[in-house]
From Swiss-Prot:
Catalysed conversion reaction: L-glutamyl-tRNA(Gln) + L-glutamine + ATP + H2O = L-glutaminyl-tRNA(Gln) + L-glutamate + ADP + phosphate + H(+); L-aspartyl-tRNA(Asn) + L-glutamine + ATP + H2O = L-asparaginyl-tRNA(Asn) + L-glutamate + ADP + phosphate + 2 H(+)
Entry function: Allows the formation of correctly charged Asn-tRNA(Asn) or Gln-tRNA(Gln) through the transamidation of misacylated Asp-tRNA(Asn) or Glu-tRNA(Gln) in organisms which lack either or both of asparaginyl-tRNA or glutaminyl-tRNA synthetases. The reaction takes place in the presence of glutamine and ATP through an activated phospho-Asp-tRNA(Asn) or phospho-Glu-tRNA(Gln).
Assembly and interaction partners: Heterotrimer of A, B and C subunits.
Keywords: ATP-binding, Ligase, Nucleotide-binding, Protein biosynthesis
Name of the protein this chain belongs to: Aspartyl/glutamyl-tRNA(Asn/Gln) amidotransferase subunit C
Sample GO molecular function, one term: glutaminyl-tRNA synthase (glutamine-hydrolyzing) activity
Cited PANTHER family: GLUTAMYL-TRNA(GLN) AMIDOTRANSFERASE SUBUNIT C, MITOCHONDRIAL (PTHR15004:SF0)
HAMAP family xref list: GatC
Length: 95
């Protein structure tokens, strides 16, 4: 697939990117090569390849989902400058 300079400019505009006019042709050439490679990948016969979610057959060992810390909300709020109804009060930043 070959991209024109106009198509590169349109893609850049849609992506809100600024491209120098002297680099548009180089981008068109590079993007065309990338798209050609993607087309080449799409033409590979993968009918005999087994689908997989992960290339390794190992499973990740996860720790048990146990509560390891106690509720320290009262302690933390005791150190806060301003607390009301269990909420931290902070100065207004935006008017």
């Amino acid at each position: 697939m070959s991209l024109s300079a106009a198509e590169v400019n349109k893609i850049a505009w849609l992506a809100r990117l600024a491209i120098d006019d002297d680099k548009v042709e180089a981008y068109a050439r590079d993007l065309s090569q990338i798209l050609g490679f993607v087309e080449q990948l799409g033409s590979v016969d993968t009918s005999r390849v087994a689908p997989m979610a992960h290339p390794l057959d190992e499973a990740q060992r996860l720790r048990p989902d146990d509560v390891t810390e106690t509720d320290q909300r009262a302690l933390f709020q005791a150190h806060a400058p301003l607390v009301e109804a269990g909420l931290y009060l902070v100065p207004k930043v935006i008017e």
